[in-house]
Amino acid sequence: EIYFEPDFGFPPDCKVYTEACTREYNPICDSAAKTYSNECTFCNEKMNNDADIHFNHFGECEY
C-alpha cells in the first residue's frame, strides 16, 4: 500500500486546468475530507459544480 504524507503547501491554481484531466494519482484532500485523484479532478469539481469545497492538503484524507 502506498501512503502519501499530507503536505499543507499552497493550494492548487485551478485556473490552469481544463475539463480534461489525466489519470495520474497525486491525491489531494478537500475541506469535506474527500480525496481527489489529483489537482485537476479537485479543481474541476470545485469549478464545474460550483462546489463549496476548499483545499485542505496534498495527500489522501485520513478518515
Swiss-Prot record:
Keywords: Disulfide bond, Protease inhibitor, Secreted, Serine protease inhibitor
Pfam families hit by this protein: Kazal_1
UniProt site (Reactive bond): 23-24
Subcellular location(s) of the protein: Secreted
A Gene Ontology molecular function term of the record: serine-type endopeptidase inhibitor activity
Entry keyword annotation includes Secreted: yes
Disulphide-bonded residues: 14-43, 21-40, 29-61
InterPro entries, sorted: Kazal_dom, Kazal_dom_sf
GO cellular component: extracellular region
Classification via PROSITE patterns: KAZAL_1, KAZAL_2
Distribution of this protein across tissues and organs: Seminal plasma.
Domain Kazal-like: residue ranges: 8-63
Listed PANTHER family: SERINE PROTEASE INHIBITOR (PTHR21312), SERINE PROTEASE INHIBITOR KAZAL-TYPE 11-RELATED (PTHR21312:SF30)
Function: Strong inhibitor of acrosin.
UniProt-recorded name of the protein: Acrosin inhibitor 1
Naturally occurring in which organism (per UniProt): Bos taurus
